[in-house]
Amino acid sequence: MTSYQSQLGDGGGGEPIAEELAESQQSISIAEFFEKNKQMLGFDSDAKALVTAVKEAVDNALDAAEEAGILPDIYVEIEDRGDYYRLTVEDNGPGITKEQIPKVFGKLLYGSRFHAREQTRGQQGIGISAAVLYSQLTSGKPAKITSKTDSHSSAQYFELTIDTDTNEPEIDHEREATWERPHGTRIELEMEGNMRARKQLHDYIKYTAVVNPHARVEFHEPEDSFKSERATEELPPETEEIRPHPHGVELGTLLKMLDATDSYSLSGFLQAEFTRVGNKTADGVIDSFRDRHFGREMAWSPPQPHEDVDIETAVSDAVANKSAEATAAFARAVADEVTDMAALSHAELSAVVASVADDIEAEHDETFGETVRENAVEAAWKSVTDDVSADCYALVDGATTTRKDDAAVEGLSRRLAEKFTDQEDARNRFRRSTLREFVDRAADATEEYDDATFGETARENVVEAVWERAVTVPDEPPTVTEVADNRDAAARLLEAMRSTDILSPPTDCLAPISEDLVKAGLKKEYDAEFYTSVTRDASVHGGDPFVVEVGIAHGGDIAVDGSVETLRFANRVPLVYQRGACATVDVLKGVNWRNYGLDQPGGSGMPSGPAVIMVHVASTSVPFTSESKDAVANIPEIEDELRLALQQAGRDLQSHLKKQRSLEKRRRKQDVIADILPDMAAKLSEVTDREPLDVEDSLARIMNNVLVERTVEESTVQLSVHNYGDTNVGPEVTDIVSQEPDGAESATVVEMDGEWFLKWSPTVGGGETATLEYEVDGDAEFDISVEGIEAEKLTVDA
């Protein structure tokens, strides 16, 4: 094989070849790139392409309507045109202005949300224009767009394609058009496709209705139709753009932010560029940064009166050219301040000397300049650090276990004290890594010479004890520019940000579905016996907050056989492909669902049973596995929240199933008693020659049920609610009467179609009875309904 190296070695020189290669290199437009890499955007097959195009158009429609505060009405139609399929998606959103229509649909990476940290379905500005690109590549036909805004009586109609060389729209035709809608947008695309992905297409439409209960969705395709009405009139909460969170940014992002900010100080930068950072939090981050950037200073105990160290004399001897009276006062005051402190660092000693010097200058009218102060600090510090072995012994002894003998503790502490004494920096200032080196060297020497072992845990405990004793230095932190120019300093700032306790990011940038609406969406599409939902508090990943939501529907008409049905969503968008590559499924399989009442062979893998499990990840930037946004990436923070949410919902399901088993057991017992009780009552009546017992009343007493019975005397109707149980109950009792009632002051009365509905909501204590009364004239018919109490715990004799 001939190589460039061999040709260059023949003496021909490399310059012509390099120039030739350089001339062949050129940039390409993003449109041209995706023209050759359609699979990256989800257009990797005819079947999937149709689903992807529907998804992109519907996502745009939902976002547009919600941003305008409009309850979405979405119409989707797929027509078989022979060689191609025609896709039409129509919405009732605010419409798009004439100037923006070509750019929105005919230019890739054109959008308003890429830099915004708030939750939206689309963000990059690729989706709908990618569908237009795929349409023109496969059918050669332009996209047809009709859009109308509230401020115009006529709509704007465009036919356009994308110039892949320039990534600019090419308008084939434009005109004003008549459209009956007051506002909205309609797009028609013709493309190659097939309906082999009909299931995924139907799933996408159905799941969109589940996760957007505020939307009305209508769908038509050649063989089927689907319509879902709104389950709520409540729009998702409006989102607000936020700044990144300090716990989520990475080093490259931080360097970019440092370089771009207008702030001079680190405190100003932190407060201006990050969310949840006020003055107090910024101070905490900067102190943590100081520890990493400058190191801490060791705080030593001052000499005690019984020790052979005299700070006052040492300071006095260090002062020159001052009056004896001022010198004595200065030395005495410094010694008194130092002796009163439990421990002090070099920086704290410097502050003491400076404060005392200022006072002495004012009292004695003599100047204690910088040199005098430095000499005094040096002399006093030598006195303080004359013997630090006692401090080191106390720290080592407190950090190690009682199994260490005194000789071992003494050996380690003595050698550690020597490391501080021999330190080049007389201030005993050190970073944590340096302190670890001190401890390791002292421990290694102790093991070698004293035959005493200090393992990893003991060493780390000693490091922690000494580090906690050391104090943060007051040095002025570097400026933003200095940190931006020093990658190591920026890395230390990043560590400080991540180690500081900071409130979770605000959630007003997110629009989670909410627990109530998760259940409403499931109820709209699944006729189940039990529903539960969980919305977790916001967490953060990569500077972006996220919220995880889980819903479970169980029983009812849900299929018993096979695996549970899983619904995956990201920012309210159904994910119908790449299930095996999605973090939501990985975590779901890892939960032991047998603990929560579902079948799961081996305790892992997809559970089976009559259940639907819905998972939703809402974030300002969902981490997808690819540009096609089919699966959520395996991010530890998101996986942790998914696991906790699934387990919490699982516990709700477990409680429900346990309760159902208890009620079933109660039902069987009640059925047995109900079978034998009439015979027992008849026999007892025969033996005692008394009236037969009220079987319903007796059954309620035996089962500790709630008994509701009616008595009618002349015009008075009385409903008695007897609670034979031990706990309070709050039934909703509704009596439907064919005649107009009177005297029902405690009830809510509604007339409908010639019938009167009387509703009470009494609270009845255990062993107590509530009486509900009203008057009615003439012969009336009654029909009673009692809700709020399980059927197994209720007996109605009315």
From Swiss-Prot:
Residue stretches of biased makeup (Basic and acidic residues): 221-233
Pfam family, one: HATPase_c
Chain spans, region Disordered: 221-245
Disulfide bonds: none
Gene3D superfamilies to which the protein is assigned, alphabetical: 1.10.8.50, 2.60.40.2960, 3.30.230.10, 6.10.20.80, Histidine kinase-like ATPase, C-terminal domain
Coiled-coil annotated residue ranges, if any: none
Keywords of the record: ATP-binding, DNA-binding, Isomerase, Nucleotide-binding, Topoisomerase
InterPro entries reported in the protein's UniProt record: HATPase_C_sf, Ribosomal_Su5_D2-typ_SF, Ribsml_uS5_D2-typ_fold_subgr, Top6b_C, TopoVI_B, TopoVI_B_transducer
GO biological process: DNA topological change
EC number: 5.6.2.2
Residues that bind ATP: N60, D91, S112, R113, G122, Q123, Q124, G125, I126, G127, I128, S129, K629
Reaction catalyzed: ATP-dependent breakage, passage and rejoining of double-stranded DNA
Single Gene Ontology MF annotation: DNA binding
Subunit structure: Homodimer. Heterotetramer of two Top6A and two Top6B chains.
Family that this chain belongs to: Belongs to the TOP6B family.
HAMAP family linked to this entry: Top6B
Summary of the function given for this chain in its UniProt record: Relaxes both positive and negative superturns and exhibits a strong decatenase activity.
Name of the protein this chain belongs to: Type 2 DNA topoisomerase 6 subunit B
Organism: Natronomonas pharaonis (strain ATCC 35678 / DSM 2160 / CIP 103997 / JCM 8858 / NBRC 14720 / NCIMB 2260 / Gabara) (Halobacterium pharaonis)
